[in-house]
Amino acid sequence: MKLTRKQATQRRHRRVRRKVFGTSERPRLAVFRSHQHIYAQIIDDTQHRTLAASSTLEPSVKNSELSSTSTCAASAIVGQLIAKKALEKGITQVVFDRGGKIYHGRVRTLAEAAREAGLQF
């Protein structure tokens, strides 16, 4: 039986999560992409704590002059915001968790924007 797109994403996510683990020295940058928004969190898996979070639901992103929050431009802003918040807390290196999504489009744009803003992964 052929997998649906959702089942394939869930299977990829389980496979990625088996390998990707965030520590306090190098936390995990988890990305979740929905149809209209994109979310990014920096998580310390050893303490089960979210250290920083950013999304297109934040007022600074929503009030910007974007036509939509589901574009690559919006995910680039979220990438810059999450990198800025991480650097303020002294986090320079992270492990990237693409959340089962393919490294393309909005996920890739967020990752590249975070790299340009100073995060290393």
From Swiss-Prot:
<dbReference type="GO" id="GO:0006412">
    <property type="term" value="P:translation"/>
</dbReference>
<comment type="subunit">
    <text>Part of the 50S ribosomal subunit; contacts the 5S rRNA.</text>
</comment>
<keyword id="KW-0194">Cyanelle</keyword>
<comment type="function">
    <text>Binds 5S rRNA, forms part of the central protuberance of the 50S subunit.</text>
</comment>
<keyword id="KW-0689">Ribosomal protein</keyword>
<protein>
    <recommendedName>
        <fullName>Large ribosomal subunit protein uL18c</fullName>
    </recommendedName>
</protein>
<dbReference type="GO" id="GO:0008097">
    <property type="term" value="F:5S rRNA binding"/>
</dbReference>
<dbReference type="InterPro" id="IPR005484">
    <property type="entry name" value="Ribosomal_uL18_bac/euk"/>
</dbReference>
<keyword id="KW-0694">RNA-binding</keyword>
<keyword id="KW-0687">Ribonucleoprotein</keyword>
<dbReference type="GO" id="GO:0009842">
    <property type="term" value="C:cyanelle"/>
</dbReference>
<keyword id="KW-0934">Plastid</keyword>
<dbReference type="GO" id="GO:0022625">
    <property type="term" value="C:cytosolic large ribosomal subunit"/>
</dbReference>
<comment type="similarity">
    <text>Belongs to the universal ribosomal protein uL18 family.</text>
</comment>
<keyword id="KW-0699">rRNA-binding</keyword>
<dbReference type="InterPro" id="IPR004389">
    <property type="entry name" value="Ribosomal_uL18_bac-type"/>
</dbReference>
<dbReference type="GO" id="GO:0003735">
    <property type="term" value="F:structural constituent of ribosome"/>
</dbReference>
<dbReference type="Pfam" id="PF00861">
    <property type="entry name" value="Ribosomal_L18p"/>
</dbReference>
